[in-house]
From Swiss-Prot:
It is a multi-pass membrane protein. It holds the Pfam family TPR_CcmH_CycH. This is Cytochrome c-type biogenesis protein CycH. The lineage of its organism: Bacteria, Pseudomonadati, Pseudomonadota, Gammaproteobacteria, Pseudomonadales. TPR repeats lie at residues 150-183, 221-254. Signal peptide: none annotated. GO terms for biological process: cytochrome complex assembly. GO terms for cellular component: plasma membrane. Required for the biogenesis of c-type cytochromes. Possible subunit of a heme lyase. Its main location: membrane.
Length: 327
């Protein structure tokens, strides 16, 4: 911030120069005016002396006229080049008052409407944080400086979760949803923070948030993981396995969290077997759809993908010994 204030001070000096230079010029004009008045007084004194000398008979009329003319020439020579003083309509105190008010008002208005805090935050974020607490403090200052930034609030909520401050994270994610809209990812983060803030007690609020998130996006990973955790804590191991399997299918093959997630699935399967249950494996059917050459010629790479969902056929009766089915 030092370089900023130096630049601001330089601009302020330039602005003050426009106010103070006329005042300095006015003082110079005043000195010229005083000099002119002195010359006039000397001229009048010289003329008076000549008049006294004529009255005493020392000078005749011609000599008097010559003396007056010489004194007048001297007066003109002394006052030559002196500009006529211009009277200021603003008065002398006003420029000094303006020179005082301009910097004061400039600083006050900048501190109120300016963005010095944002400039300082930009400088801070250009340097790597020394700790997680340092990063959280920076994000808190950023959220205070930009309370309408949904992105800043989102990262602040994630930082709170990393520090096990789930109650604070839940409040921040609620504000984020209010600003950015009810996006599935934000709803999932809010539900997760609220669940841990409630000491891992499943509540209708958390259920509503996860339901809404998965309705908008059935692949929303935070909600799937949270539902799996809640099912495992509630000893509903088959549900936990199902949710975590759905989550596992969304993770990239190189994702490091796949190992931990698979360990959770195996742990849930062991618990299910220990309680006398069996792990239900869902049947997966792979369907390959191929287009004819004529159909391929009419398609483009940007065309939408068609999803096929198989449905069980139910018998409706027999005709000629053959069973009839309907969907």
């Amino acid at each position: 911030m030092i370089d900023f204030w130096l630049a601001a001070g330089l601009l302020l000096l330039i602005a003050l120069s426009f106010l103070l230079i006329p005042v300095l010029r006015g003082r110079r004009a005043q000195r010229e005016e005083d000099r002119t008045a002195l010359n006039v007084a000397l001229y009048q004194e010289r003329v008076a002396e000549l008049q006294v000398q004529q009255d005493e008979g020392v000078l005749n009329a011609a000599q008097l006229d010559t003396g007056r003319a010489e004194a007048a020439r001297e007066l003109l020579a002394d006052t030559e080049g002196v500009e006529k003083p211009r009277e200021s309509r603003l008065g002398k105190p006003l420029p000094f008052l303006a020179a005082f008010l301009v910097p004061v008002l400039g600083v006050v208005l900048y501190l109120h409407y300016g963005a010095s805090d944002k400039v300082e935050l930009t400088r801070e974020f250009s340097q790597p944080p020394v700790s997680m607490a340092d990063m959280t403090q920076r994000l808190e200052r950023a959220a205070a400086a930009q309370p309408d930034s949904a992105e800043g609030l989102y990262f602040l909520g994630r930082a709170y979760m990393a520090q096990d401050r789930s109650a604070d994270a839940a409040k921040v994610f609620e504000r984020t949803v209010a600003l950015a809209g009810r996006q599935p990812e934000l709803l999932g983060q809010w539900a997760q923070a609220q669940y841990f803030a409630d000491n891992k007690q499943w509540s209708p609020k958390v259920q509503a948030l996860t339901d809404e998130a998965l309705k908008l996006d059935p692949k929303e990973v935070t909600s799937l993981g949270l539902l799996g955790i809640a099912a495992f804590e509630g000893q509903r191991y088959q549900e936990a396995i199902d949710y975590w399997n759905r989550l596992l299918a969304q993770l990239p093959p190189q994702d490091n969290s796949r190992v931990a997630l698979q360990g959770g699935i195996d742990r849930a399967a062991e618990k299910l077997k220990e309680s006398g249950g069996t792990v239900a494996h869902k049947t997966v059917m792979t369907v390959r759809v191929d287009l004819s050459a004529e159909a391929k010629a009419k398609t483009l790479p940007s065309d939408s993908v068609v999803h096929l969902r198989p449905r069980r056929l139910r018998p409706t009766g027999t005709v000629g010994g053959q069973a009839r089915y309907r969907r």
